[in-house]
From Swiss-Prot:
Protein name stated in the entry: Uncharacterized protein 032R
Biased composition (Basic and acidic residues): 30-39, 170-184, 237-252, 305-314, 390-399, 433-474
Biological process terms in GO annotation: DNA-templated transcription termination
Record field: compositional bias (Basic residues): 48-58, 117-132, 195-227
Length: 629
């Protein structure tokens, strides 16, 4: 009784493809077929596909190096020949069944593919069974497939058979190369295409195609081999190098996103319906609602958001305070996947409902980076780090106030550090619970009397304590308020540790003043133009004011009513009240640097305006302006 190993050796010598994966019975059958077929083959190269021995179950045609899900239970390490590559003919004109008894011919030593003697044989039909049966594969041998799609799903060999039968040339006219499946399909479906009688096409070497992958996903992407071997002199088997499988293509050989074009083949991009490319009705409100951003974003792995300490005492700067315990340096934030448009904006004072996204200038970035502010227990105060200083902070007073506050805080933290309990837990909310008054008193107290702070250490620690109970939106403090907040970030913020950023877009050439008369942006506005999604709508009055104030180094107090700029205030309150009766007198009394013509025009304007009964403030203002006040 022949062992599998012997059968394998025989099969190898005969050059049967796929022998290393076959079971014993299959091997015997293949060897038996072998002689019969080869005679028939040599006799008529154009044999009808009906006779083609596609029965031989050649297993999966993958390099046998990867034991992917190999069928063969008995796989001997000897069978190292990778069947899909070897261009060895399945038939060679060797003794037919007699061949089975010749394991003697192949000494066990020479099992490496480079040595196998009869591997290339003059006639060759690359027989392969399609890895999975597609419904199309059940067609009868002769007839041509019903539709292009079915055609493309057929195994290559099947196409080759049909083409041969229809008398279609298997090699391209342009270069002698074998046609790709798509080309074959086109020809087959296009009717019994141009029967160009060519001289027997020269044997083209096997293609090294990068797409050969350990587990073939679909029959469509099978590596291209020249479909028909025409008898030609035996070449030395050593020429054939093992193709390098490029590491870049993993087993998703045809990833949909950007298939690397194979040589000479057009790339077909196909997107399946339900992946990110759905541009539905949602495009009209790009950033509204909590939906994901509708254009495909690259997915990144997301870690759990760390808690990050942030010093928000002075809103637009970082302080220079050198106190170790004071702040914790923010670790570098890795790229996180951007999921939701932002909800909280440090710029708006009102607590905003969950779904609301401010469209205004200052929040433009904040609604892309969404931030949740939450207070956290104080264990983390322990791991101090030297605070980064921000060079933009040029404001001495701010820095000093903050530093003094920080030092005081550090001192009392040190004075209490006897027990391990975190400092903040120690005490209930302070008696003086009115934030406003305390905030106004603070900077002076912190600078002037650090001693009192040591005497009564709980005083400014206890305020964040109140927030631990019910975390609410962070309100920014003026410089001295000793208030270190913690907030949890799930998205990267670009710079520094402070979630405040000047608005992306300030109206271009406009002077400061006209900002004042801009109508407020409505809270929620679903009717936005496309353009406004890119250029955010104009910032609200309050945002603008705060923005300029912050750069002037003033503190922005959340609660205070909107104030005019200083010079406006002068304009409004220091101007003597006008009455129409004294107007002419006033004009005549005015220094003569104003030429009478101009005064005249001013007067005319005044008449016209008051005739329209527009409100006096506007009139007054325009007059003052015209008179060069």
């Amino acid at each position: 009784m022949v062992t599998v190993t012997e059968l394998r050796a025989t099969a190898k010598n005969l050059g049967i493809r796929g022998y290393s994966t076959m079971r014993k019975a299959e091997l015997e059958e293949a060897i038996r077929d072998h002689g019969r077929v080869s005679e028939a083959r040599v006799a008529s190269p154009r044999r009808s596909p009906a006779r083609s021995p596609r029965k031989s179950p050649a297993g999966r045609k993958s390099p046998s190096k990867s034991p992917a899900g190999r069928k063969s239970p008995s796989k001997s390490p000897a069978g190292r020949k990778s069947p899909s590559k070897s261009p060895a003919g399945r038939k060679s004109p060797s003794k037919s069944p007699a061949g089975r008894k010749s394991p003697s011919k192949s000494p066990a030593g020479r099992k490496s593919p480079s040595k196998s003697p009869v591997r290339k044989s003059p006639s060759k039909s690359p027989v392969r069974k399609s890895p999975r049966k597609s419904p199309a594969a059940k067609l009868q041998a002769g007839d041509r497939p019903a539709s292009m799609n079915i055609c493309k799903n057929l195994p290559k060999q099947r196409l080759v058979d049909i083409a041969t039968e229809m008398g279609i040339d298997l090699n391209r006219e342009s270069d002698g190369k074998p046609k790709t499946k798509d080309q074959l399909c086109a020809d087959i479906m296009g009717g019994a295409g141009r029967k160009s009688p060519r001289k027997s096409p020269s044997r083209s070497p096997v293609r090294k195609s990068p797409s050969r992958s350990p587990v073939r996903k679909s029959p469509v992407r099978s590596p291209r081999k020249s479909p028909v071997r025409v008898p030609s002199p035996v070449r030395s088997p050593v020429k054939e190098k093992t193709p390098v499988r490029s590491p870049a293509r993993s087993e998703d050989a045809g990833s949909d996103l950007a298939p690397r074009p194979r040589r000479g083949k057009a790339v077909r991009l196909d997107y399946d319906e339900d992946d990110d490319y759905s541009y539905g009705a949602s495009t009209d409100n790009l950033f509204s609602g909590n939906k994901e951003i509708p254009f495909p974003t690259r997915k990144r792995r997301t870690r759990k958001p760390e808690k990050v300490f942030v010093d928000v005492r002075s809103p637009h700067t970082l302080t220079d305070s050198e106190d170790e315990d004071d702040m914790v340096e923010v670790p570098e934030l890795e790229d996180k996947e951007i999921t939701m448009p932002g909800v909280l904006s440090p710029y708006s004072d009102e607590i905003v409902e969950r779904g609301y996204v401010s469209q205004g200038g200052a929040d433009y970035i904040n609604y892309i980076y969404r931030t949740e502010y939450a207070l956290e227990s104080d264990e983390s105060f322990a791991r101090g780090a030297r605070p980064k200083t921000n060079k933009r902070d040029s404001d001495r007073a701010v820095r000093e106030a903050a530093a003094a506050a920080a030092i005081a805080r550090a001192l009392d933290r040190r004075s209490q550090s006897g027990n391990d309990e975190p400092a903040v837990r120690r005490r209930s909310a302070p008696t003086d619970s009115s934030r406003e008054s305390r905030r106004d008193r603070e900077p002076q107290r912190d600078i002037a009397e650090p001693q009192r702070d040591i005497a009564e250490p709980q005083r400014d620690i206890a305020e964040p304590q109140r927030d631990i109970a019910e975390p609410r939106k962070v309100r920014f403090r003026e410089a001295g308020s000793a208030d270190v907040r913690v907030f949890e970030r799930d998205e990267p913020k670009e710079y520094g540790r402070v979630p405040v950023r000047p608005p992306l877009f300030m109206p271009a050439g406009e002077p400061l003043q006209p900002l004042k008369f801009r109508p407020k942006t409505p809270k929620i506005d679903d009717t936005i133009h496309r353009a406004q999604m890119v250029l955010p709508s104009k910032p609200s009055q309050k945002e603008t004011d705060n923005y300029y104030k912050q750069f002037a180094g003033e503190a922005v107090r959340p609660s205070e009513p909107v104030q005019w700029d200083k010079d406006d205030q002068v304009l409004y309150h220091k101007v003597p009240a006008w009455d129409d009766s004294s107007y002419a007198a006033a004009v005549s009394a005015w220094p003569m640097s104003v030429d009478p013509k101009q005064a005249e025009s001013v007067f005319a304007e005044f008449e016209q305006l008051s005739a329209q009964d527009s409100d006096l403030i506007k009139v007054r203002k325009s007059i003052m302006k015209a008179l060069g006040y």
